[in-house]
Amino acid sequence: MKKLIGGVSHHEREIEELREDREYAIATLQLAMDSLENPEERGGGLLALRAVAEAYGGLGAVAAQAGISRESLYRALSPKGNPTLKTLVAVLKTLGLRLSVTEKREANAA
């Protein structure tokens, strides 16, 4: 990633904020998981999951703890990735989180 002279890249700052604020990281993951059901938003959701993984140990360490090759995790959490349920569960478990099911709320429901 290109370094900014006298500054910090947006990506580096995002990783720092995710690392410093666990509630923010969890909220980011909740939005990311919601976006996975929409094909137009899926890539952004996967990148958000990737950013949280980077913030909590880096992709290499998360992959090792999750029992996944680093290359597979990079592919799965890329904008065109298609992670398996096994991969999602393993990554979330490594981050100290788990999947949860809630009732879908329609945007136009009263």
Question: What spans do the regions from the language model cover?
Answer:
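Short alpha-helical DNA-recognition segment
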Residues: 51, 55-74
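Amphipathic alpha-helical interface surfaces
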Residues: 25, 45-49, 58, 69, ...
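N-terminal flexible/basic segments that precede or flank functional cores
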Residues: 1-48
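Short, residue-level hotspots on alpha-helical faces of the histone-fold
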Residues: 31, 51, 90-94
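Long, contiguous binding/interaction regions
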Residues: 107-110
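Major-groove DNA-recognition helix of helix-turn-helix-type DNA-binding domains
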Residues: 80
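DNA major-groove recognition helix of helix-turn-helix/homeodomain DNA-binding modules
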Residues: 85-102
